[in-house]
From Swiss-Prot:
UniProt: NAD(+) binding residues: 289-303
The organism of origin for this protein: Prochlorococcus marinus (strain MIT 9515)
GO CC term (a single one): cytoplasm
Organism classification: Bacteria, Bacillati, Cyanobacteriota, Cyanophyceae, Synechococcales
Protein name, as recorded: tRNA uridine 5-carboxymethylaminomethyl modification enzyme MnmG
Alphabetical UniProt keywords: Cytoplasm, FAD, Flavoprotein, NAD, tRNA processing
Family affiliation: Belongs to the MnmG family.
Domain of life: Bacteria
NCBIfam families tied to this protein: mnmG_gidA
Keyword Flavoprotein: yes
Gene (UniProt): mnmG
Length: 654
């Protein structure tokens, strides 16, 4: 039996886990003036990118912009360590434009460690936390006495105890983690690192349920063994674009190319012949994997009609030979993996440096959390990142920031910051996690948001930087830069609105010819910019623009003007939802009688009996569709009531 040893060290906040959620949480609480300790099993692997060495992509880039707008760190580091950047969905509308950066994973980790080491109020500690320590606190109301569980500290594997007022668990895939290659498995949080022991049992003993999920990562191959001449090149095309709104952020990393290959019929045949050797199809594990990042064997089985799948070869850094084979994760045995890789064009003589593997792990279903990411069961215990059932560094970082903010607000006896669906992708993600009983790893998608035109990456600072400044995470320098940008946006919008162009002007005739858009009489530059084939770049070309403006302001003005009508409609919808949140719900409603509600919504609404729509929207299991159905049901009831009253009045008057 391990002897318990009390440490004389105590902290306001302890963060368990040094991944992307843990780093954001620890930096946030420390920046806000609270003594913080970040505990991790391996101090050399902080903010590691164990899967894809990339940040951003559809919806994920919007999350990164939002974290940065609030004062978080992931966007800055992604910008500083990017070795390739691209804009995805560039041919589509601005609601789905997405910046994606290939990063140097070792440089990313190194710079994060430097930031942590130089952050005031923050201590780093290498230890495995195996137990949460709690105390029971009695609270009294007029009619009753209640006992609540409250966090008081942690215990390490070797028995040392540390006290803390608040704890944030960001354990990633490490809780009872087990990695699989074929039918062989071993205990590990990820390749080369031991799993976290004891903490799962501690959570169970405190009444917190965990379940199991799976994810995976592809093999890494030696770039010296690849025939790049046989491959399509994917160059860096957006090195001048940034996740961060901080004008000081720069990138001095060399920009390099990725490459594209494809699976072949031989690849597919080899996979089909060996499906029985994979952990999932062989029946060795039954945990659910991520729907939007399937293994190569899943792709071959589920899309059997496809003859080929695109595979991306992505460098893991400037000073490493490792190439990440994106889109080729697998659970097949190691010898078959190499055979598979060699069926890909350009890789017929490749050397595999690290095999692909699947990892299954315990997670906390987030229906056990509040919208602040505090656990319902235990006061001052928060949970963030992959342990909440998400997948992705971006989702983890956003949750870490939110948990850090709300842990400090709870200690300051302030109300939590609740991010709404209509205000941010952060709010969309957390709302989805809390209200849905998810059975597979969750990733953020633009399709998950009803307000994606409003929640663009380019306007994340306009939406969230005032809040970041109010909280205390945005400093005076950033705040001044933000206000200057807002001023420029307003002034340029006004200039375009008040500057007219006559159809007789030579510039007008040139724009007509190039855009195919007729100018009659005269028009303002603002109205001209609303036309689909006219862009701010045309104004620059014909000296109608303010060329001294930052690119972000030019782009922001054009998007605001082009989509003004859509944005107003979406804002009206948001305002309507906000008004509806105050709409009262009669306490006597029997939700079982409303068959348009989901079964889970009926059960939870009957149990909690919310008094208004705002409260109902925060109940786990009650989706936006449920709220809409409830609103329609109430409207029908009101109409029926009005008709009945009208009929009675007519009867009485006659």
């Amino acid at each position: 039996m391990k002897k318990q040893q009390s440490s004389n060290e105590s902290f306001d906040v302890i963060v368990i886990g040094g991944g992307h959620a843990g780093c954001e949480a620890a930096i946030t609480t420390a920046k806000l003036g609270f003594s913080t300790a970040l505990f991790t099993i391996n101090l050399d692997r902080i903010a590691w990118q164990p899967c894809n060495p990339a940040v951003g992509g559809p919806a994920k880039s919007q999350l990164v912009h939002e974290v940065d707008a609030l004062g978080g760190i992931i966007g800055k580091l992604a910008d500083e360590t990017a070795i390739q950047k691209r804009i995805l969905n560039a041919s589509r509308g601005p609601a789905v434009w997405a910046l994606r950066a290939q990063t140097d994973k070792r440089e990313y980790s190194k710079r994060m460690i430097e930031i942590l080491q130089n952050t005031d109020n923050l201590s780093l500690k290498e230890a495995m936390i195996t137990e949460l320590l709690i105390k029971e606190v009695e609270t009294f109301t007029k009619n009753s006495k209640n006992t609540t569980k409250q966090i008081k500290g942690v215990k390490t594997f070797f028995g040392t105890c540390y006290s803390a007022k608040s704890i944030i668990i960001t354990a990633g895939t490490f809780l009872e983690g087990r990695i699989w290659i074929g039918n062989k498995s071993m205990s590990a949080g990820r390749s080369g690192e031991q799993a976290a022991q004891g903490l799962t049992e501690s959570l169970h003993s405190l009444g917190i349920k965990t379940e199991r999920l799976k994810t995976g990562t592809p093999a890494r191959v030696d770039k010296k063994s690849i025939s790049f001449d046989a491959l399509d090149i994917q160059p860096s095309t957006a090195s001048d674009k940034y996740f961060s709104f901080d004008p000081k952020i720069k990138n001095d990393m060399p920009q390099i190319c990725c490459h594209i290959t494809r699976t072949t019929q031989k690849t597919h045949e080899l996979i089909r012949n060996n499906l029985h050797l994979t952990p999932i199809y062989g029946g060795f594990i039954d945990s659910k994997g991520p729907r939007y990042c399937p293994s190569i064997e899943d792709k071959i089985v589920k899309f059997a009609d496809k003859n080929s799948h695109q595979i991306f070869l992505e460098p893991e850094g400037i000073n490493t030979p490792e190439i990440y084979v994106q889109g080729f994760s697998t659970g097949l045995p190691e010898n078959i993996q190499l055979e598979l890789l060699r069926t890909l064009p350009g890789l017929n003589k490749c050397k595999m440096l690290r095999p692909a593997y699947a990892v299954e792990y315990e997670y906390i279903p987030a229906t056990q959390l509040k919208l602040s990411l505090e656990t319902i069961e235990i006061d001052n215990l928060f949970s963030a990142g992959q342990i909440n059932g998400t997948t992705g560094y971006e989702e983890a970082a956003a949750q870490g920031l939110v948990a850090g903010i709300n842990a400090t607000r709870k200690l300051n006896m302030k109300d939590p910051i609740i991010f709404s669906r209509e205000s941010s992708y952060i709010g969309t993600m957390i709302n989805d996690l809390i209200t849905r009983d998810l059975k597979e790893p969750y990733r953020v998608l633009t399709s998950r948001s009803e307000y994606r035109l409003t929640l663009r990456g380019d306007n994340a600072d306009r939406r969230l930087t005032p809040l970041g400044f109010e909280i205390g995470l945005i400093d005076e320098r950033r705040w001044f830069a933000h206000k200057e940008k807002m001023k420029l946006l307003k002034e340029e919008n006004s200039r375009l609105e008040n500057t007219r162009l006559k159809c007789t002007d030579e510039i007008a005739r040139n724009i007509e010819l190039e855009s195919g858009s007729k100018i009659k009489g005269s028009t303002t530059l603002k109205d001209l910019l609303k036309r689909p084939n006219v862009h701010y770049s045309d104004f620059i070309k014909y000296d109608l623009a303010n060329k001294s403006l930052p690119i972000a302001v030019m782009e922001g003005v054009e998007i605001d003007i082009k989509y003004e009508g859509y944005l107003k409609r979406q804002q009206n919808n948001i305002d309507q939802i906000n008004r509806q949140s105050l709409k009262s719900l009669p306490i006597e409603i029997n939700y079982d009688l409303i068959d348009t509600l989901s079964l889970e919504a009926r059960e939870n609404l009957n149990k909690i009996k919310p008094t208004n729509f705002g409260d109902a929207s925060k109940i786990p299991g009650v989706s936006k569709a449920d709220l809409t159905a409830l609103l329609v049901w109430l409207k029908i009831k009101e109409i029926k009531k009005e008709k009945t009253n009208s009929f009675v009045e007519k009867k009485l008057s006659s």
